[in-house]
Curated annotation (Swiss-Prot):
The chain crosses the membrane at residues 32-52, 76-98, 111-131, 177-197, 223-243, 287-304, 320-340, 348-367. It is a multi-pass membrane protein. Component of the ubiquinol-cytochrome c reductase complex (complex III or cytochrome b-c1 complex) that is part of the mitochondrial respiratory chain. The b-c1 complex mediates electron transfer from ubiquinol to cytochrome c. Contributes to the generation of a proton gradient across the mitochondrial membrane that is then used for ATP synthesis. Its main location: mitochondrion. A ubiquinone binds at residue 200. Pfam families: Cytochrom_B_C, Cytochrome_B. It comes from the Eukaryota. SUPFAM superfamilies: a domain/subunit of cytochrome bc1 complex (Ubiquinol-cytochrome c reductase), Transmembrane di-heme cytochromes. This is Cytochrome b. Keywords: Electron transport, Heme, Iron, Membrane, Metal-binding, Mitochondrion, Mitochondrion inner membrane, Respiratory chain, Transmembrane, Transmembrane helix, Transport, Ubiquinone. The gene is mt:Cyt-b.
Length: 379
């Protein structure tokens, strides 16, 4: 037998990337997973290198970022690659989740739930990284988001002080945020390996939404070459954004050192959190806003409930499901835009309506496969 099939370590890679049986009809929509793996590697490498020159101290953090730009060889490039990579990471995550919803990938509960868990941890990791440069937006975003814990009855105020390490966001907060931002990507990497492990046990979905057990092809060369082509396209677009538009995803306020005495006119997170931020702001009650913020993501877990009994999944053969799906996508874009708008009328009222429709579309899409299966069996 071939060496790659007998060596105890190489054969694991072989079964994952070479001889993996794959559906013969996978489209470009199935490339986002491999792109996410590539971006994760880029983020890990650039993050570890940047950590060697970064100082997680409130007095030196902002200056250390400037030092990385000015005093380190290609430090400016590493920092821009890392910050731009975060935006591309979440872009591919949303496309990956969107493809999963459209084609019914939630019928594999273990794969789906681990994926949603990865998304949750990545949201936390990205938020921690947003705080590290210790600019104005970093400081006040940390203050606003950590203050949400105070909405928890009884324990809230104590938990806020515990997270802060004092009575306000300061050096202890930054130090522990830096430590967590460094460690969490390795947790994500472990979950990604588990995600791929379960994916290879249950198999992949496909554009037709039917079993592909009778029509499989080897992953290499067919899909490995296809992935390489997409990698080249990604690298071209990624480097254009990094080198020509490197600051387009950054907030101008974050180029000002953190000042606890001056509040920015408009506090907002990065673009990939704006939809959740709009939901948080749209609900007048503080606890209600926090619950809405959590449910905006946790609602994805509902899709994997009782999927073993489903005869229909995804939107492929249902015009109503497709209408709901694209309405949800439009609603997501609307919430993202509203999250970047000032917290005033009429944006608050529109955001509240968009929040209600977001959960309506989500819950209806979640229930529709079960309703369709019930009506089919009843008839």
């Amino acid at each position: 037998m071939s060496f790659r099939k007998t060596h105890p370590l190489i054969k694991i890679v072989n079964s994952t990337l070479v001889d993996l049986p794959s559906p013969a009809n996978l489209s470009v929509n199935w490339n986002y997973g491999s792109l996410l793996g590539l971006v994760l590697v880029i983020q890990l490498i650039t993050g570890i290198v940047l950590a060697t020159r970064f100082s997680g101290h409130s007095d030196m953090s902002f200056d250390s970022v400037i030092s990385i730009y000015q005093d380190s060889n290609y430090g400016w490039l590493l920092r821009l690659v890392h910050s731009t990579g975060a935006s591309f990471f979440f872009l591919f995550i949303y496309l990956h989740i969107g493809r999963g919803l459209y084609y019914g990938s939630y019928v594999y509960p273990e794969v789906w739930n681990i994926g949603v868990l990865i998304y949750l941890i990545l949201m936390g990791t990205a938020f921690l990284g947003y705080v590290l440069p210790w600019g104005q937006m970093s400081y006040w975003a940390a203050t606003v988001i950590t203050n949400l814990l105070s909405a928890i009855p009884w324990l809230g105020p104590t938990m806020v002080e515990w997270v802060w390490g004092g009575f306000a966001v300061g050096n202890p907060t930054l130090t522990r945020f830096f430590a967590l931002h460094y460690l969490l990507p390795f947790v994500v990497t472990a979950l990604v390996i588990l995600h791929i492990f379960y994916l290879h046990i249950y198999g992949s979905s496909n554009p037709l939404g039917i079993s592909s057990n009778t029509n499989k092809v080897s992953f290499h060369y067919y899909y490995s070459v296809k992935d390489l082509y997409v990698y080249f396209v990604f690298f071209f677009v990624f480097m254009v954004f990094t080198l020509k538009y490197g600051y387009v995803f950054m907030d101008a306020e974050n180029f000002i050192p953190a000042n606890p005495l001056v509040t920015p006119t408009h506090i907002q997170p990065e673009w990939y959190f704006l939809f959740a931020y709009a939901i948080l702001r749209s609900i007048p009650n503080k606890l209600g806003g926090v619950v809405g913020l959590l449910l905006a993501v946790l609602v994805l877990f509902l899709f994997s409930v009782s999927t073993s009994k489903l005869l229909f999944s995804g939107t492929i053969y249902s015009p109503l499901a497709r209408l709901l799906y694209w309405s949800l996508v439009s609603n997501f874009f609307l919430l993202t835009w509203l999250g970047s708008c000032p917290a005033e009328s009429p944006y608050n009222e529109v955001a509240l309506v968009a929040t209600v429709t977001y959960f309506t579309f989500m819950l209806t899409m979640c229930a529709l496969p079960h309703i369709s299966t019930y009506l089919y069996l009843k008839s």
